[in-house]
Amino acid sequence: MDYYSILGISKTASAEEIKKAYRKLAVKYHPDKNPGDAAAEKRFKEVSEAYEVLSDPQKRDSYDRFGKDGPFAGAGGFGGAGGMGNMEDALRTFMGAFGGEFGGGSFFDGLFGGLGEAFGMRSDPAGARQGASKKVHINLTFEEAAHGVEKELVVSGYKSCETCSGQGAVNPQGIKSCERCKGSGQVVQSRGFFSMASTCPECGGEGRIITDPCSSCRGQGRVKDKRSVHVHIPAGVDSGMRLKMEGYGDAGQNGAPSGDLYVFIDVESHPVFERRGDDLILELPIGFVDAALGMKKEIPTLLKTEGSCRLTVPEGIQSGTILKVRNQGFPNVHGKGRGDLLVRISVETPQNLSEEQKELLRTFASTEKAENFPKKRSFLDKIKGFFSDFTV
């Protein structure tokens, strides 16, 4: 029996040509289209077996070099115990070949929008289940987010059972392969033209049955646990960011890997600084005299080594003006330098003045010139044409 002849293709056929030929023949000889036809059933098994081998690069190479008795053939050759020994295997191959067309892992998933899991279908025929991922929230001060910090978290979940090493049974002889599904965890049923796989009712999809369960985990292979996890928080994190710690979630079952731990960051606000990306904003209130004459002012920073820096405020500065102090902002979480410190000037008008202070201001006002207030002059010039009573 030549697999290429069975599918009606040449030995140089591409993977796409192999799949196309198989699909055409599989639909033609499918048992649901040929009920009670033993010859069609035999042909269906043959084309499924041929596709199973030729669609796998390793198996195809072995078949091309050694024939049906190659090293990937299994105990009975490609067509024996390792091939399409029963209709269930042939139907599973059929579903797998058509599943990719619908973006899923099975024909049933593709047709019904990935509802296979809802009906008990499993993509892991050996019953292995990856552990669930966990998520925790961690609160940081503004300074911790700026400088980075090490934290210890207590996480509840499942760990692998130490008594049975996660196997569910201390003695390997206490575990046997499920006879109903032959260790696959699934049984295949034909309904009309369609075939679908469902969870094996005998083993619950595990593919095995534990006859002598471990006393510590009761055959589950894992136990509840609380553990301390060390977390490195890099400098520059912000609220809403998420750190992924691979393998720190719940332990998997039946040899599957553990899930992951996701640490969600919440950063407290700061009484002085406001963050905008990697930049910091500092609102600096100054008196109108300092604004008019200019000054030098010591302002706080987040840098541990300095703690403050000297800012030069130029004379005649206006409220709302932003002065930039480079590299005094937040560190970039990806290590790409630091942001800037943006100092927003807020000129404060004096209140609760004494009579002496008021008199001094009146004296100053009497000496004002138009060039002292260019914005005021510009505004008055603009509205003069509309309101005749406005005077400079």
From Swiss-Prot:
SUPFAM superfamilies: Chaperone J-domain, DnaJ/Hsp40 cysteine-rich domain, HSP40/DnaJ peptide-binding domain. Zn(2+) 1 binds at C161, C164, C214, C217. GO terms for biological process: chaperone cofactor-dependent protein refolding; DNA replication; protein refolding; response to heat. Its main location: cytoplasm. A zinc finger (CR-type) spans 148-226. Zn(2+) 2 binds at C178, C181, C200, C203. Its cofactor is Zn(2+). One of its GO terms (molecular function) is unfolded protein binding. GO terms for cellular component: cytoplasm. Residues 2-67 form the J domain. Homodimer. Participates actively in the response to hyperosmotic and heat shock by preventing the aggregation of stress-denatured proteins and by disaggregating proteins, also in an autonomous, DnaK-independent fashion. Unfolded proteins bind initially to DnaJ; upon interaction with the DnaJ-bound protein, DnaK hydrolyzes its bound ATP, resulting in the formation of a stable complex. GrpE releases ADP from DnaK; ATP binding to DnaK triggers the release of the substrate protein, thus completing the reaction cycle. Belongs to the DnaJ family. This is Chaperone protein DnaJ. It comes from Chlamydia pneumoniae.
